[in-house]
């Protein structure tokens, strides 16, 4: 199976569903993790220009250890919008690239605006990615797949 986990920030997917993704890797699945934002505002002391490469490197190294392909953030923190065609197109291209059998992303009722925007973008892009005539760089339509929400806030 091909598994695509799309989180907003570097560490969101890793915190919320690393165990699930580890099981997927162990059974032989191809797992791709995509962070939509670069984590630029994720620290109160370290400035964005230092933090962005640090978090990207941490994500890459974690991916190597886990046998997971990691795709880095394309937006700054709090600069991701679910009603923006450019944002949706970037997520469509991620989905078409990964050709997933299922997608994991944030709960649409999350507390953080970046997370809810990510959930909405993934939901909308998952359908758009199936359209064979959609003008994307990949030019490879994906199939319509289930979307599962990761949520550590509501409890298990």
Question: What does each of the following model-derived ranges do?
Answer:
Residues 1-98:
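Active-site rim/loop-helix segments in enzyme catalytic domains that contact anionic ligands
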Residues 1-6, 82-156:
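Metal-dependent de-N-acetylase/amidase catalytic core
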């Amino acid at each position: 199976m091909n598994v695509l986990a799309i989180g907003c920030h570097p560490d969101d997917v890793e915190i919320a569903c690393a165990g699930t993704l580890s099981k997927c890797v162990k059974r032989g699945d191809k797992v791709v993790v995509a962070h939509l934002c670069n984590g630029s505002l994720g620290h109160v002391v370290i400035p964005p220009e230092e933090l962005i490469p640090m978090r990207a490197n941490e994500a890459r190294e974690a991916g190597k250890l886990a046998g997971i392909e990691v795709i880095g953030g394309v937006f700054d923190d709090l600069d991701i919008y679910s009603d923006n065609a450019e944002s949706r197109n970037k997520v469509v291209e991620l989905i078409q690239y990964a050709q997933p059998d299922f997608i994991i992303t944030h709960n649409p009722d999350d507390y953080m605006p970046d997370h809810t925007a990510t959930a909405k973008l993934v939901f909308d892009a998952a359908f758009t990615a199936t359209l064979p005539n959609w003008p994307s760089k990949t030019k490879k339509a994906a199939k319509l797949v289930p979307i599962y929400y990761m949520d550590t806030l509501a409890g298990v």
